Regions:
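Ribonuclease/tRNase effector modules and their secretory precursors
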Residues: 1-92
Length: 92
């Protein structure tokens, strides 16, 4: 995916960087992982389909939550993958 295919809320991106030490720009590269695992995010139900992408960025396994809006990928959050996500990725 190209960088201009992504969008996010700048305040949310700054808060995410402070909390998780992962920028949304770097996190967008999760889709470059040929083994990226994409699942529907069933934990959130605010009327908008959300997805989780689990993949490696610079050797670190991360999980991003995102949605699709008007042919763009809107990143909602990004963090290091938890143990459950690590196992799902390893077994995919």
């Amino acid at each position: 995916m190209e960088a201009d295919e992504f969008e996010w809320d700048d305040a949310k991106a700054a808060a995410n960087l402070r909390k998780h030490k992962i920028s949304f720009r770097a996190a967008s590269r999760v889709f470059d992982d040929p083994l990226v695992l994409i699942e529907q995010d069933v934990a959130e139900d605010d009327g908008e389909d959300r997805f989780l992408a689990i993949g490696r960025v610079e050797g670190v396994l991360i999980t991003i939550a995102y949605t699709e809006r008007d042919d763009r990928t809107r990143i909602i959050s990004a963090r290091k993958a938890n143990n459950h996500e690590q196992r799902a990725y390893d077994h995919s």
